Amino acid sequence: MEYKMNFDVILVRYGELTTKGKNRNDFTRVLVNNIKNKLREYEKQYQLKKEFDRLFIELLDPTVSQPIINIVKNVFGSSSLSLAKRVDRDLTTIANCAITLVQYYQPDTFKLEVRRSDKTFPLTSTEIKQQLAPKILQQTNVKVDVHHPVLQIDVEIRHQFTYVFINKIKTIGGLPVGISGRGLVMLSGGIDSPVAAFLTMKRGMNVEYLHFATPPHTSEEALEKVKTLVQKLHHYTGQNQQRLHVVNFSMLQHELMHIPDASYRITIMRRMFYRIANILAAKWNCQAIITGESLGQVASQTIESINVINTVSPLPVLRPVLCFDKNEIIAIAKEIDTYQTSILPFEDCCSLFVPKNPVTKPRIAQAEFQEQNLMWQEIIDVIIRKNIKTYVIDRDEIYEES
């Protein structure tokens, strides 16, 4: 439904935040800050007021209601929102507002719901509905359908005002980004890791991004693809800025070509990724590593491989898509608009160096044996000091950090 009528308030429901008890104020504070960050362009056209179970975005310019809705519904931390008219608490005024809505949208059927948040109001919700419904029916040609109405009108009576609104708009849900700490996402540029980043942020964790490149074997187009993915993901955060760290892995990649058993090459490479990620996570105050690994999807993602790779990571490794099948991951990627970018034909450093027959059931002792004559510790030290570029994502801009 297009909302062409001028409304003066957007009512935002907290959803999952209502279960957070003593932490509730922290959750709502972060949500409010994230919404304000995303609405910077419209900061002079609205006022935001917080109540116990709702946020009220009061529109100083009703013409910006649709762009504000499009932004707020994609900020993690709310369950739904509604465009509302704010009116006085007398029943005649409420009925007139509802009649105006019915006359404007001209639905064949409607349903009326009443919620009395202010329990001191002299009538119950049922009594209010019994008085409002006949007034609406007398002034319009609409019919009542309580099961499948074309238009649902909700009336919410609060302490100072009444809010009359139509149709709840489902929002993205989750928890506000920033409430669950900070993690480091290993972003390959494929389909899975952007989905893993999205799901992690949906649980309230702010993230930094880590990408491994092997120039000249990986192209500048491959890096631009990763930058585009990060910008798309940043759209959901509500954070002012996020950062993408690009590690030049070429020196270590060439060292790994000296592994005696080539079938262990990907296993050892991923162990090196995790070692570097842990060092950088500590440097950037991240409490977890996040990957797009999906159990059994490729040779390096069998449970045996995951176990061998995990042993080098002191930090917990979160794998949000571990038990998703490929079609489920693709469905989410399409929903969050990362899929078409992820399938662009630019290879990452893993795909370029996959051996013909990668080991699917590696052993820790054998992995350690393959590493023992490599100069990986010295090379990682050089990488950390010299071979990392950082890009800042700020709204629609991305630029290299000086």
Predicted regions and their residues:
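RNA-binding accessory domains that recognize and position tRNA/RNA substrates
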Residues: E2-L184, P194-Q242, T311, V359-I364, ...
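General small-molecule cofactor/ligand-binding pocket signal
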Residues: D145, H245-V247, L318
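Generic beta-strand/beta-sheet core signal
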Residues: N167, L210-F212, V247-S250, T291-G292, ...
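A conserved beta-strand->alpha-helix junction
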Residues: V230-H258, D348
